[in-house]
Amino acid sequence: MANFSPLTVFISVTSLAVFQFLFHVGSSWLSTRLTGGFHKLSARQKIEWNSRTVSSFHALVVGCFCLYILVYDDAVNADPVWGDPFMVKLNVAVTSGYLISDLLLIIYYWKEIGDKYFVTHHLAALYACYYVLGEGMLPYFGNFRLIAEFSTPFVNQRWFFEVLGYSKYSLPNMVNGVLMTISFFIVRIAVIPIYYGRVFSTFGTEAFHRLGLGAQCAWIISSVSLDIMNVMWMIKIAKGCYKVLYHRDGKLTKTQNNGKLE
């Protein structure tokens, strides 16, 4: 039986309200002061711009909190399956509020930013949040997954540069592309052995059996599926980064041989 504490419900609702405010007010207010290009965007682009701004803010908040928990929350680190999930619940509650907020925006602005993949992703993520918030299960693993959010701001920044008219060979775009590739590898690929090392360490334990077959299957299947997608995305991102760097180098060599630089 799910047991959502009043505190986690309050944080989730507050999180939803804050992210709605940031989308409708905060993002536009800040963006107009950071770049004049925001005024030149179409209404459709402004909607996606605000959505991605909120996405980046959420990623930084929960990512930093995730790292803090991984380093300092002894209870969760000592018992990754049933350790005291209080700190993790706070972080996951913030994420739940964001996911619900983003789902509402996707549905309301379906013509502009509607995407069946993101709806499926958000619903699956909320299902995972249920196990942490409602059942107190798998706090370490639920929190560990949030470290992947650190790559999100770089992905969003690539889109910002694109709509602002930056060339893919421009220095800011190339630096961001390299940072995106590196961050994606570190927080989504390099951590895979660490994650599954902790997963395998729980097999056969009393804590693992207490989960029940349903939670066990949901946990393992979702983890493997997510990491398969991460590997596929990593390959695509790495190829794109290599292609841009290789062609940029080729262009510089060609222009230098012609006696001028573009």
Swiss-Prot record:
It is found in: Membrane. Keywords: Membrane, Transmembrane, Transmembrane helix. The chain crosses the membrane at residues 6-26, 53-73, 90-110, 122-142, 177-197, 218-238. The gene is tlcd4-b. GO terms for biological process: lipid homeostasis. GO terms for cellular component: endoplasmic reticulum; membrane. Residues 44-246 form the TLC domain. It is a multi-pass membrane protein. InterPro entries: TLC-dom, TLCD. It comes from Xenopus laevis (African clawed frog). Belongs to the TLCD4 family. SMART domains: TLC. This is TLC domain-containing protein 4-B.
